[in-house]
Curated annotation (Swiss-Prot):
Region span, Disordered: 124-152
InterPro entries linked: Ribosomal_uL22, Ribosomal_uL22_bac/chlpt-type, Ribosomal_uL22_bac/org-type, Ribosomal_uL22_CS, Ribosomal_uL22_sf
GO molecular function: rRNA binding; structural constituent of ribosome
GO biological process entries: translation
Sequence ranges of Low complexity compositional bias: 124-143
Role summary: This protein binds specifically to 23S rRNA; its binding is stimulated by other ribosomal proteins, e.g. L4, L17, and L20. It is important during the early stages of 50S assembly. It makes multiple contacts with different domains of the 23S rRNA in the assembled 50S subunit and ribosome.
Lineage, broadest ranks: Bacteria, Bacillati, Actinomycetota, Actinomycetes, Micromonosporales
Family in the record: Belongs to the universal ribosomal protein uL22 family.
Protein name per the record: Large ribosomal subunit protein uL22
Amino acid sequence: MPGKGDAPVLPGARAVARYVRISPMKARRVVNLVRGLPAKEALTVLQFAPQAASEQVYKVLASAIANAENNERLDPDALLVSEAYVDEGPTMKRFQPRAQGRAYRIRKRTCHITVVVEAVAPAAPTKAASKKAAPAKQTTPAATESKTEGAE
C-alpha cells in the first residue's frame, strides 16, 4: 500500500542497455534531449539527432516501448519518457605506444543506458484552457469612434 507521501504508481515499462561502448558524457547529452517527451516524439528526435549515441538510445527507447506494449498491454501512443539516465560502466584500459619507449593510456569508457516509459492519463481541460478558447470581446464601432474623436 502506498505511503502518505508516495505518488500514485503509473503503469509503465523500462529497458536497459548495459556495457554500451560510448562515453557516458556523450550518451547523457542525447538522453537529455528526450527526457519528458512523449515516446513517439522522442523516437523522432533521436532518429534525426546527429550524435552517434542517438542510435543506441533509440534502440533502448524502442525496446522500452515494446516492453510496455507487449508485457503491460499499454497503448504506445499514450506513453511518456518519464525517466532516462546514463550510468558509468567499466572502463577498458589500453595503451598507445609512443616515442622513446613511452606509452600513453587510452580509456575506452562504457555506459549503461536506462529508459523508463509510463502511460499518461489524458489531461482534463483546465479553467485556464477554457478561458483561452473563449472568443475575445468585440468592441462596437460607436465606442471606438468616440475614443478617436476625443484624441483629435
